[in-house]
Every structure is written in structure tokens, then in C-alpha cells.
């Protein structure tokens, strides 16, 4: 029951997530006979991961629960402001981790090894691995895991490097691991849906390649690489995204900002109250155009016109907002660049 997504919650409510699930199987080897069964079981877990990854990806882009906010009182004044701190968190982490391209070095100083490492760096530069690494880290920070596909060049399409690097979308890629000690990866999967709504699964094991259309094997061939070419890069053991653990605080921040703007608009658009005087709709609309209202006291009663206002304490609201924001920075390990108690912390010190 713990893996079932609760669809009964309002779309404006914070979604509870606790990292991506590791997909495992108890079979010892992936064969033609069991690949379909293993795939079906793996897809049930992957579908849950995919749903959460889609949510986190949308959240990163700014599609957040506050956009579905509703109000019972004065619904015409309903601000839906996205203060996209999730994007800020991911951008900081990616910039910090990918500031310089990865360079391979060796401990052994022999000339042969040095030349080999130099050649390896040249090949990685030719494949623009630095840009691929940045995409990997971006997915890691958003949804807690990322995938890379490494394949040899197609015949006739050879370039400077004899291989190609691809960053896969974790919404349609996954790796299945063994339940035995060591959790050895048994197969990597990349799938897509065509215009006829048929799902094509590309499945790699260390010895075979299978192409399935739905449940049917339409192609199989030996894997000459001798290894699964799909590699998973989890951000951490729990496969948690960088802002996933502060989703409630991020939604609270959006709510504070939206309510704050509601308070300002409700003061500007306050109701007008008439005490001991009557006025018709036509007269009121005319008075609004003129910018003045004239009333007269009769029969000894005092007539008055005023506004109904409820003032929002901006100081307390700002204190609450700053408290939420500072908690987000502390939990996510990001230095406070706007002053405060953590101004002296560098990115490295906070992360450590």
C-alpha cells in the first residue's frame, strides 16, 4: 500500500514524496523467456517513479500547487504567485558542481599512461561530455537520479570519438537491479511511445539486446559490448531531489506571498460602508466616476461613509517569510546570499 499514489488529495495540496524507488528483481539472469515478465513488474514500480519525476520536473519549471489555489471569501481577489525557489536551488547546485569540466588524471606518471589519459580527455571533449555532465547533474538535483547511454558510433557515422554519449530522460529510462548481495544491474531499459500509441522498449543486458513492441519481442541480438550501456547516477542513496525535502516549505512560501498580495489588494479594493444613509446603484457609480460622495445627516442621526478594511501586519509577515526561506537554505545546504547568520558560509562549507 505504501507505493500507491493518493489521487484523492486536492491538486493545491503539497504532494508527499520520499525519493525514487530502486527497481529490483529476484531472477538471476534476464533471458528471452523471462524478459517480458521482468519488464512488466519493473514498469509497475517505474510508473510510480515516473509520476513523481513528472511532478518534480513541472515544479522546477514553475507549475506548482499554488496555481490551483482557491478562496471562499472574496474569490475575485485570489493571487497565485509562484516564487520559484526550487529553480534557484537546482541552478545553484548545478552551477556549483559543474563549474569546471571533469578532467581525468592518473597516479602513475609513466609516459604511456599519461598519453592515454590525454587521449581520453580529448575524446570526452570531442563528445562535449561537459554539457552532458551538466544535464546529468540537473536531473539529479531535480528528481534524485539520472541516466546515461553510451553506444559505439554507427557504421559510416564515425567521428573523432568511437562512441556516442546520450543523457536519457529518467521519465522513460530505468535500470533493474538484482536483489542479491551487491545489487548487480541486470538490465537497462529505454522506451518510447509512437504515434500509434505502441510502446517500444529497448532492453540491454550484459549479453543481449531485446526490442519489444508492447509484450512482443520483435528483435533480439547479442550485445557485443559485454556490459549494460545504460548507467544510473543516483544523487544519493534515497534518490532524493535537491528541493524535494523542502516541498512543504516551498509551498508555504508561495502561500505567504500570494496571501500578502491578497491583503494589499483587499485594502485597495475595500468595501465601502454607508452609515445612516441610502444611495442608489446609479448614484454610487456616478460618485465613483467623480471621485467623491456627498451624504447628508437627517433626523438627528449622523451619516457617514467609510471603508471596511482589515490590515495585514507586513512586519510579522516578512518575518515569517524570511524564517521559511532561511529554513529552506539551511536544509538544502545553500549559503544565504542576502545576509543573516549564514552569510560567512561558503558553498563548500555548507555542503560539507
Locations of regions flagged by a protein language model:
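Extended, charged amphipathic alpha-helical segments
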Residues: 218-352
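Short charge-dense sequence patches
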Residues: 29-40, 61-77, 83, 87-88, ...
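Extended, regular secondary-structure scaffolds
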Residues: 134-143, 147-239
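Extended, helix-rich architectural segments
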Residues: 1-163
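Intrinsically disordered, low-complexity segments enriched in small/polar residues
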Residues: 17, 34, 60, 93, ...
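Intrinsically disordered, low-complexity boundary segments flanking structured domains
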Residues: 42-43, 78-79, 83, 129-138, ...
